[in-house]
């Protein structure tokens, strides 16, 4: 399985989490996903009254130095971590 296929698979797996990840984890995933799929952020930063959109933009901007492949690998690693945490909580 190639990197792109594994990335797409983990993008689907994240939807199977039984517990919603923290906002911090969600923003990390968002930034990595956008960087992997679209490359560096290409829009202006949302205004201060659009707090949710601004946080998402900041998360994407934070990873703009990563290549698409690096972002895919980091995304896969993060999803695996979240799945492991969910599995350990389910077994206790």
From Swiss-Prot:
Keywords: Cell membrane, Cytoplasm, Lipid-binding, Membrane, Transport. One of its GO terms (molecular function) is phosphatidylcholine binding. It is found in: Cytoplasm; Cell membrane. An acyl-CoA binds at residues 30-34, 52, 56, 75. The keyword Calcium does not apply. Mostly expressed in seeds, stems, and siliques, and, to a lower extent, in leaves, flowers, and roots (at protein level). Highly expressed in root and shoot phloem companion cells. GO terms for cellular component: cytosol; nucleus; plasma membrane. Residues 3-88 form the ACB domain. One of its GO terms (biological process) is response to freezing. Pfam families: ACBP. Binds medium- and long-chain acyl-CoA esters with very high affinity. May function as an intracellular carrier of acyl-CoA esters. Confers resistance to cold and freezing. Interacts with phosphatidylcholine and derivatives, but not phosphatidic acid and lysophosphatidylcholine. May be involved in phospholipid metabolism. The keyword Cytoplasm applies. This is Acyl-CoA-binding domain-containing protein 6. Disruption phenotype: Enhanced sensitivity to freezing stress. Belongs to the ACBP family. Signal peptide: none annotated. Interacts with PDLP8. It comes from Arabidopsis thaliana (Mouse-ear cress).
């Amino acid at each position: 399985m190639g990197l792109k296929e594994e990335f797409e698979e983990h993008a689907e797996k994240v939807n199977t989490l039984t517990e919603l990840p923290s906002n911090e984890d969600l923003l990390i995933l968002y930034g990595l996903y956008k960087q992997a799929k679209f490359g560096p952020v290409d829009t202006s930063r949302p205004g201060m009254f659009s707090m949710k959109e601004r946080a998402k933009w900041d998360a994407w901007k934070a990873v703009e130095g990563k290549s698409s492949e690096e972002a895919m690998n980091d995304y896969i690693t993060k999803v695996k971590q979240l799945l492991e945490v969910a599995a350990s909580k389910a077994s206790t």
